[in-house]
């Protein structure tokens, strides 16, 4: 692979990796939101805490790998042929993409607190309340961090090409 082709691929990688993390956030909202349906209400308090605890072990790798890849690819783009980024005006897009993606981590404490409440079945006999709070936080987080990061990195890649 030529250096030019490698650089073009590097310019695309943040958009590709952030597509995966944004998709995961949307999947979480759609799939986890099913627990809020009235048809599951009789089973939620018994099933949801265990489901979340065991499920979290299965899907945590997406978060552990996905977001650091976003950061790595964003930083690599800012150091590889910086002069090219400057000349195309794409530097700001890579910086903003990195900024918004890192912003996702500002929600970690809140997210972990809400997850702990779900896993402990809090409030007793109505864990749907905790799930609703987590879903709301997840939606806001996706809209103000993941979506803008994805848009910025697409703009960065398009302007750098």
UniProtKB/Swiss-Prot annotation:
Signal peptide, first to last residue: 1-18
Entry-listed glycosylation sites: 45
Membrane association type: Multi-pass membrane protein
Gene Ontology terms: cellular component: membrane
Top-level EC class: oxidoreductase
Enzyme Commission number, as recorded: 1.14.-.-
Record key words, sorted: Glycoprotein, Membrane, Oxidoreductase, Signal, Transmembrane, Transmembrane helix, Virulence
Protein localization: Membrane
Main location: membrane
Family per record: Belongs to the epoxidase xenD family.
Full protein name: Epoxidase gkaX
Gene from which this protein is expressed: gkaX
Pathway: Mycotoxin biosynthesis
MF GO annotations: oxidoreductase activity
TM helices/strands, residue ranges: 59-79, 92-112, 139-159
Record's function text: Epoxidase; part of the gene cluster that mediates the biosynthesis of GKK1032, fungal natural products containing a macrocyclic para-cyclophane connected to a decahydrofluorene ring system that show potent antitumor activities. Within the pathway, gkaX functions synergistically with gkaB and gkaZ to form the cyclophane. The pathway begins with the PKS-NRPS gkaA which, with the help of the trans-enoyl reductase gkaC, synthesizes the polyketide-tyrosyl acyl thioester product which can be reductively off-loaded by the terminal reductase (R) domain in gkaA.
């Amino acid at each position: 692979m030529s250096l030019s082709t490698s650089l073009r691929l590097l310019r695309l990688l943040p958009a590709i990796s952030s597509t995966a993390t944004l998709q995961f956030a949307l999947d979480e909202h759609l799939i986890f939101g099913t627990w809020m349906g009235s048809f599951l209400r009789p089973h939620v308090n018994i099933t949801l805490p265990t489901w979340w605890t065991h499920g979290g072990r299965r899907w945590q790798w997406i978060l552990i790998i996905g977001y650091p890849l976003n950061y790595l690819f964003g930083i690599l783009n800012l150091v590889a042929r910086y002069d090219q980024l400057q000349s195309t005006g794409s530097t700001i897009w890579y910086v903003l993409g990195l900024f918004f993606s890192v912003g996702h981590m500002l929600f970690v404490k809140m997210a972990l607190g809400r997850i702990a409440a779900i896993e402990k079945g809090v409030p007793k006999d109505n864990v749907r309340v905790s799930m609703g709070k987590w879903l709301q936080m997840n939606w806001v987080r996706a809209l103000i961090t993941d979506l803008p990061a994805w848009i910025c990195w697409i703009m960065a890649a398009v302007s750098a090409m």
